Regions:
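PLP-dependent amino-acid enzyme catalytic core
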Residues: 1-502
Length: 502
């Protein structure tokens, strides 16, 4: 299995190279040249396996330059009971709302209480093995732009991993207090955290620019280092996300909720487009998905794109109570466009250049039609998000976070507009306790709220009786290690200083 750049047909690399490098030298993203196709027989075999077994099968089909022993080692070390609380790191929960049964895929049982753990607990294992195969002896410098959850999950995954250093940038006012405290208290001798004076898109653009600046790469090379990424632009981040959609389908069949071969819908709260893209890739492999429901907050660039075929980032940026979706440039959409353009790197490059230069592009009528046939885009604002949290809690005592609530709200819009009652899997991406203030405001009368984040956690527990995840409870007495803030245009120098490179 080889990988191409979405912007340069001539760039062909192995899986290990794609993971180690993170992003193509031309700025494109790596995608597999082909996808394995799973028959009904394959899915029936997957039914009998646990989560680890399903993961091993999927990884073996994409990582052809990894041995079976290497893949087993990665999986067994990543998805442990100690890290995820059970043998199934991605369990389904069931709740009812307005007469509909919701199949909620809880992806937040890992060490940082967000869905990013599903990929970022295994990525360090993928990366260290990839480095040995491709750049043996070099240290990888992991650069991360985060809207909240990726940063902490990457820091936790890479802390004290040999031959790696990790630097995380986050928007100074664009993450929740809990997310900020999680990052700034991070342990490890190879970690650095810095806020930027800007939003997530500024952070992500800054990181991409550093990646593709030859002078900076040359300085790292001279110091026996290379850049890699822990954002979902890295194929090693995206691949593990395919697994949990396949596993959720198998779990629904085993639970008697659907029969093998039945179609499902997938509902995903979407920012950078990686999570929903993973479900799309699973469908290419044979997972029977009827519709991909893309849920946005007030930063509704994606829902507009799905409706019109025009992607336009020239719009107001909202800071919302679902900050992991406060994004106007969805990086992984590039991979979908590449696929829908018939794997045409020239077309993809043209669209991405337009986005970079004028902030917008329009896809062809053929691509518009294909997107409309497979995707539904909707959005809701903060008040609708809170109303959904309250409705779900009042109806079934199920407590969800703000991002999951956006997905539930948009799912309800979809059913109302289409009448489609196909069984649906809703991706739940974070613990409600990561966003205690907003969730507490939703389920209580909103008065007499504590000012301290951890007092809010305790108050939310009193109101809801939903268990507080141990990793979040343990943060209360941790002191901050990091407090740096930098301008966006100072990010390159900050990286060099952090690495002690002159």
């Amino acid at each position: 299995m080889l990988y191409n750049s979405t912007q340069n047909a001539a760039e062909v690399v192995s899986a290990a190279q794609a993971i180690a490098q993170g992003i193509s030298k031309d700025g494109g993203l790596f995608v597999p040249q082909e996808f394995p196709k799973y028959s009904a027989e394959t899915f029936n075999e997957l039914l009998k396996l646990d989560y680890k077994g399903r993961a091993k099968k999927v990884f073996a089909d994409f990582l052809s330059d990894f041995t079976e022993e290497e893949i087993n080692d990665c999986v067994e070390n990543a998805y442990t009971k100690e890290k995820f609380g059970s043998d199934n790191p991605a369990p389904l929960a069931y709740a009812k709302l307005n007469g509909k049964e919701l199949n909620i895929l809880e992806l937040w049982h890992g060490p940082t209480c967000a869905f990013k753990d599903m990929a970022l607990q295994i990525l360090p294992h993928f990366l260290t093995k990839s480095l040995k195969k491709t750049y043996d002896g070099k240290d990888a410098v992991i650069l991360v732009a985060t809207s909240g959850d990726t940063g902490k999950a990457a820091l936790e995954g890479f802390k004290d991993v040999d031959h790696t250093k990790i630097i995380v940038f986050y928007p100074v006012d664009g993450v929740s207090p809990m997310q900020k405290h999680q990052m700034n208290t991070q342990e490890g001798n190879n970690v650095t955290v810095c806020a930027i004076k800007g939003n997530f898109d500024d952070a992500q653009t800054g990181v991409k620019k550093i990646f593709t600046t030859p002078e900076i790469s040359a300085k790292l090379e001279a110091n026996n280092m290379l850049f890699s990424s822990a954002n979902s632009i890295n194929w090693g981040r995206l691949l593990p996300q395919i697994v949990y959609y396949i596993s959720a389908y198998c779990d629904l069949v085993n639970a008697g909720k659907i029969a093998m071969g039945d179609k499902i819908n997938v509902v995903v709260p979407t920012g950078n487009f990686g999570n929903i893209l993973a479900s799309y890739y699973a469908s290419i492999m044979g997972l029977p998905i009827n519709k991909f429901i893309c849920a946005s907050n007030s930063n509704n660039v994606l829902s507009d794109f799905i409706k019109t075929g025009v992607y336009d980032k020239n719009r107001h940026f909202y800071t919302t109570i679902s900050p992991s979706m406060d994004i106007l440039v969805s990086s992984n959409l590039e991979r979908l466009l590449y696929k829908l353009a018939g794997n045409n790197a020239d077309t993809t490059k043209e669209l991405m250049t337009a986005l970079k230069t004028v902030g917008k592009y329009e896809v062809s009528d053929e691509i518009k039609a294909e997107i409309k046939s497979k995707f539904f885009g909707g959005f809701c604002d903060d008040e609708q998000t809170k109303a959904t949290i309250k409705a779900l809690f009042d109806t079934d005592k199920y407590l969800c976070d703000t991002h999951t609530a956006v997905a539930v709200n948009v799912y309800e819009q979809y059913v109302e507009q289409t009448g489609d009652t196909t069984p649906s899997v809703i991706a739940s991406t974070a613990s409600p306790y990561k966003f205690s203030k907003a969730v507490l405001e939703a389920v209580s009368d909103g008065t007499d709220l504590p000012e301290n984040e951890f007092d809010m956690v305790e108050k939310l527990f009193e109101v809801s009786n939903a268990p507080v995840p141990a990793p979040l409870a343990a943060l209360k007495d941790k002191k901050a290690r990091f407090s740096d803030v930098t301008e966006v245009n100072s990010m390159p120098q900050y990286v060099l200083d952090a690495l002690n490179i002159k």
